[in-house]
C-alpha cells in the first residue's frame, strides 16, 4: 500500500470516528485492548496489552490514533494492561465464536464473489445460532458482523464465564459435529412385553433435541420420499448407497413402508439393513447442518476480537452489532457501508479490472485511473486492489 493511500484511509477513518458512537463491551475496564495502526510495510504489528486506562476515553483514542483495526479481549483480568498473560491474572472469558468465509467448506475461494461468500457465511451463522439457542439454551447473545468476511457471536453467561480451553473445545466439537456417530448418538430403550425372561432393547435417535432431532428430521423426509417413489424407484435409489445391494434395498423399503412411524421416531433397529441408511444420514446431517466455526477463537480464553462500531482496515466496512430480529434482512454490503463514505467521488488507480458489489450495485472499474464513489474506492484500497490517485 502506497503512502498516499495509507494517509488517505487513515484520515477518512478518523472522520468516521469523529462521528461514531461506540458502545463498549461489558466490563470494558477489565479487558485487554489492542489495535493495528496504519504503519508502512507488508507486516501489520499489533499494539496490545493496553487497558482503557492506557488508552484514555475510547472516543478520544479513536479520533487521535485513527487505527486500522481495533480489538478487545474475550477475557477479563485483574490487571488487563500487564505485559504478560500471567501478570494479568485471568478472571473469566466470554464464549466467542468466529465464522469466516475462508474456513467454510461450501466456499470456493477464487470462484465465489465477495457477496456469495458473505451469503454462505450468514447461512452458517443461522445454523450456529440454532445450536446456541435451541441446544444450549443461551438467551443473551451478541451477534456482530466482523466487517470482513464473517460474523462473531459472544455468549456472556455466568455458566460459561470460567470455562477453560478444554471445556470450550467440547462445545466446538458439538457444534461442528466432530466424531458424531450412530453409536454415540443413539439411546437404548427397553422393549416392553410380559413374560420376557431377557428384556430386549431398541436403539433410538433422541428426536426431541440436539443432533438427534436434526438427523431424525432428515430421516422423516427420507421415509416420505421413499414411500412416494414406490418400491422399484426406491430400490434404484437405495442401491446408490455404499454397501446397499438390491436385496438390502428391498428390505429397507419394506421396513420403512411397514414401520413408517417407528422410523420417523428415530428407531434405527427396525431392520439390520436400515443401520446403513441411518449412518449415512448422520454423516449427511453433519455436513449440511454443522457450524464450521474457527476453533482457536473459541478455545482461546485470551483471544482479542474486533470492537463493534470500529472499522475493518481490510474493507472499510463497519464492524456492526446486529439485532437478532433484524438478522434475516441484514445485508453487510449495504448496511455496513459507513455513511461518511457515501455521496462523494474519488479517484483511484487499479492495475487490473476489478468488480465491486456494494450498496446494491455492481461497479466494474480499471485498469488505470477511475473516478468512483468513495465507499467503493475505500473498499478497494483497503483490500489492496487499488491505490489512491491524485485528484
UniProtKB/Swiss-Prot annotation:
MF-aspect GO terms: DNA-directed RNA polymerase activity; metal ion binding
Subunit structure: Heterodimer of a small subunit (PriS) and a large subunit (PriL).
Gene3D superfamilies: DNA primase, PRIM domain
General function of this protein: Catalytic subunit of DNA primase, an RNA polymerase that catalyzes the synthesis of short RNA molecules used as primers for DNA polymerase during DNA replication. The small subunit contains the primase catalytic core and has DNA synthesis activity on its own. Binding to the large subunit stabilizes and modulates the activity, increasing the rate of DNA synthesis while decreasing the length of the DNA fragments, and conferring RNA synthesis capability. The DNA polymerase activity may enable DNA primase to also catalyze primer extension after primer synthesis. May also play a role in DNA repair.
Keywords, in A-Z order: DNA replication, DNA-directed RNA polymerase, Magnesium, Manganese, Metal-binding, Nucleotidyltransferase, Primosome, Transcription, Transferase
Main EC class the enzyme belongs to: transferase
Cofactor or coenzyme needed: Mg(2+); Mn(2+)
Pfam families, per database record: DNA_primase_S
UniProt record similarity statement: Belongs to the eukaryotic-type primase small subunit family.
Signal sequence range: none
Record PANTHER family: DNA PRIMASE SMALL SUBUNIT
Organism: Halobacterium salinarum (strain ATCC 700922 / JCM 11081 / NRC-1)
Name of the protein: DNA primase small subunit PriS
The keyword Transferase belongs to this UniProt entry's keyword annotation: yes
Organism domain of life: Archaea
Covalent S-S links between cysteines: none
Record-annotated active site: 98, 100, 294
Gene Ontology process terms (BP): DNA replication, synthesis of primer
GO CC field: DNA-directed RNA polymerase complex; primosome complex
Cross-referenced InterPro entries: DNA_primase_S (IPR002755), DNA_primase_ssu_euk/arc (IPR014052), DNA_primase_ssu_PriS (IPR023639)
Keyword Manganese in record: yes
Enzyme Commission (EC) number: 2.7.7.-
